[in-house]
From Swiss-Prot:
It comes from Mesorhizobium japonicum (strain LMG 29417 / CECT 9101 / MAFF 303099). Belongs to the methylthiotransferase family. MiaB subfamily. Monomer. Its main location: cytoplasm. Pfam families: Radical_SAM, TRAM, UPF0004. Binds 2 [4Fe-4S] clusters. One cluster is coordinated with 3 cysteines and an exchangeable S-adenosyl-L-methionine. This is tRNA-2-methylthio-N(6)-dimethylallyladenosine synthase. The gene is miaB. It comes from the Bacteria.
Length: 450
């Protein structure tokens, strides 16, 4: 009897680092159901779109992609081959059954908190059902997700993401996360430590803890006391082989003393912090429901820099929020000048349906948003390039992560997240080596062995 060919799944990931982690865990759940991953959509028996709902027109982009996959499914049907189509992630959560109504070729819609049920859902799909699973059973998800095989962890590389917290209770008026990811939920300490230990045992050298509001994480520690993220980082730093720790994304209101002390006292906690502020105008910050002022943010950065003088800062900015005046925008520019960011992400405000911001008056014209964004990005780019140039001639610990794009090269990563191009003979993947920065590229550094 001829053996049945293995089923293959193609997962396309949109958006944030947590979606990357979620896609990996979907792959783990499907591996237990007999699927192997493929990078070629033409080979797939199942196509999953793991979607993001943060930016404007996110849903329309998904529907456009589904149109292309629908045509592929029709061609497969003519040839007598089945192709299943699924939509996962935050667009799935927000749109629900509307996805199947608008795109009937879709077989399943599964939210961020229910993808551990994929094998059961697929069994029902093969029985002829169309499935929409979008509840918020987050504890159930992490309790039931299968662990990846060691070989799969090794294949993914020497850096890894580890989700420790999901959801957000801040309700910033521009943001859909509380509606698509739910309220804040923290994973238990034992579960996080066990996953980090498995990663380290498989050769992972750097772990980035993920959460929509990661520094709101809290849980009962191994000593029975209530822990925050700082105490968790101290515990993870004890794991043999785990040389580097990071976390993202944070809210200024949840940067407590213990977390700041972790930056001071833990060599393995990298001196890089992504701490979004969104605006430098107190009036706009209030309208955004950020619950801090520009002065609060700057004072917090002073405390963090006093604890870790070599820390590099990253941020998020939104320009053109409803009611933003030229004076408000200039306040943002002034805050950026004061902070001097090593890197940052900046966007035009885009109204998200169902959020308070979308209902506010005095929306800023698109042309003015464009002009302000260009001015802000020019300043941020100048600061980023200045930070890179300041490292030329210095000796830096670099984690070698992967082969380079060019023959004879490998790519490493500085403590401040910049890619570093080195000679392939400088070290093996997973090594942390000392290099001397020789020059800068547009988004990377070049180095030689120190």
């Amino acid at each position: 009897m001829r053996a049945t060919a293995a089923k293959k799944v193609f997962i396309k990931t949109y958006g944030c680092q947590m979606n990357v982690y979620d896609s990996q865990r979907m792959g783990d759940a499907l591996a237990a159901d007999g699927y192997t991953a493929t990078d070629a959509i033409d080979e797939a028996d199942l196509v999953l779109l793991n979607t993001c709902h943060i930016r404007e027109k996110a849903a329309e982009k998904v529907y456009s992609e589904l149109g292309r996959i629908r045509d592929m499914k029709a061609e497969r049907a003519i040839a007598g081959r089945e192709l299943l189509i699924g939509v996962a992630g935050c667009v799935a959560q927000a749109e629900g059954a509307e996805i199947i109504r608008r795109s009937p070729a879709v077989d399943l819609v599964i939210g961020p908190q229910t993808y551990h049920r994929l094998p059961d859902v697929l069994a029902r799909v093969r029985g002829g059902e169309k499935i929409v699973e979008t509840d918020y059973a987050i504890e159930d998800k992490f309790d039931h997700l299968p662990q990846p095989k060691r070989a799969e962890v090794i294949k993914r590389g020497v850096t890894a993401f580890l989700t420790v917290q999901e959801g957000c209770d801040k309700f910033c008026t521009f943001c859909v996360v509380p509606y698509t990811r739910g309220s804040e939920v923290s994973r238990p300490v034992a579960q996080i430590v066990a996953e980090a230990e498995r990663l380290a045992e498989a050769g992972v050298r750097e772990v980035t803890l993920l959460g929509q509001n990661v520094n709101a994480w809290h849980g009962q520690g191994e000593n029975g006391e209530e822990w925050g993220l700082g105490r968790l980082l101290f515990r993870l730093a004890e794991i043999p082989g785990l040389a580097r720790l990071r976390y993202t994304t944070s809210h200024p209101r949840d940067m407590d003393d213990e977390l700041i002390s972790a930056h001071r006292d833990l060599p393995s906690l990298m001196p890089y912090l992504h701490l979004p502020v969104q605006s430098g105008s107190d009036r706009i910050l209030k309208a955004m429901n950020r619950r801090h002022t520009a002065r609060d943010y700057l004072a917090l950065l002073d405390r963090i820099r006093a604890a870790r003088p070599d820390i590099a800062l990253s941020g998020d900015f939104i320009v053109g929020f409803p009611g933003e005046t030229e004076a408000d925008f200039e306040a943002t520019m002034e805050l950026v000048r004061q902070v001097n960011y090593a890197s940052a992400f900046s966007f035009k405000y885009s109204p998200r349906p169902g959020t308070p911001g979308a209902e506010m008056p005095d929306h800023v014209p698109e042309t003015l948003k464009d002009e302000r964004l260009q001015r802000l990005q020019a300043l941020l780019l100048k600061q980023q390039q200045g930070f890179g140039s300041s490292l030329v001639g210095s000796t830096i610990d670099t984690l070698i992560e992967k082969p380079g794009r060019q023959a004879g090269q490998k790519v490493g990563r500085t403590p401040w997240l910049q890619p570093v191009i080195v000679d392939e003979k400088a070290g093996e993947i997973g090594d942390i080596i000392q290099v001397r920065i020789t020059k800068t590229g547009y988004n990377s550094l070049f180095a030689e062995l120190a």
